[in-house]
Amino acid sequence: MAVLYAGRPVQKCERSRLMFNIDQPDSAPDNEDHDGDVVMHGQGSFFGRRKGHKLRAHQADLIENLLPHLSLQIDSPAPEPLTTLFDPPVEHMRLEIGFGGGEHLIAEALAHPDTGFIGAEPYVNGMAKILARIEAENIRNIRLFAGDASELLAWVPAGSLARIDLIHPDPWPKRRHWKRRFVQDATVAAMARALTPHGEFRFVCDIDGYTAWTLAHLLRAPCFDWLAQRADDWRKPWPNYTMTRYGRKAEREGRRANYLRFERL
């Protein structure tokens, strides 16, 4: 589909190269260290930090006592339909990958009480923060997963998710670490399997290199269509978007996020 860029019609692949320099390598210096320890687990390929600041007493208590009640166990088959994870069953299911402090996930869960949400986050401090919000606001439509989101995608039944959100993921700027980025051909295919027809994958990132990377992977995926029709569609947040703490930090530091929406065909 052609859209307008600088007053002339361009195809989506051409536009993505114009806007995000898809064919150019990332400009981050190779000696830039990533903040945190690198870990792997299970049969997947998760890389990232597991724990940062020491947990406060109440946070530790939530991890020990509340998390087991909300945590998904993927060593047994997923329920079908997936909506029966909740009692009573919800109407739709959504997934947020790497929810950080949980600001966006909490806001979405409160705004859509008839939708069930799965939040995947291996970072213990982020898990403790969202557990505190869940407890304080008595939120009943969130389940949590502390492992590799690619394993979770393989676990859910095909066509069971109405939407997947990936908001300000770790960009892994060094070229030798690009294979650690969540968006890969294999995970794009896994998301396509998990999403219902006309479901959406939404991606927010303030690093143009990773935005370009994501566009390149999604534009070559036959099961997805980029929904942008004009520049503001990726330059501005979608309606009712909840800015995360990391998003506000990026704005303070002068980095503008891009907001991408892809439809599962």
From Swiss-Prot:
Its EC number is 2.1.1.33. GO terms for molecular function: tRNA (guanine(46)-N7)-methyltransferase activity. GO terms for cellular component: tRNA methyltransferase complex. Gene3D superfamilies: Vaccinia Virus protein VP39. It holds the Pfam family Methyltransf_4. Disulfide bonds: none annotated. It catalyses: guanosine(46) in tRNA + S-adenosyl-L-methionine = N(7)-methylguanosine(46) in tRNA + S-adenosyl-L-homocysteine. Substrate binds at residues 174, 206. InterPro entries: SAM-dependent_MTases_sf, tRNA_(Gua-N-7)_MeTrfase_Trmb, tRNA_methyltr_TrmB_bact. Keywords: Methyltransferase, S-adenosyl-L-methionine, Transferase, tRNA processing. S-adenosyl-L-methionine binds at residues 96, 121, 148, 170. The active site is at 170. Pathway: tRNA modification; N(7)-methylguanine-tRNA biosynthesis. Signal peptide: none annotated. Belongs to the class I-like SAM-binding methyltransferase superfamily. TrmB family. Catalyzes the formation of N(7)-methylguanine at position 46 (m7G46) in tRNA. This is tRNA (guanine-N(7)-)-methyltransferase. It comes from Rhodopseudomonas palustris (strain ATCC BAA-98 / CGA009).
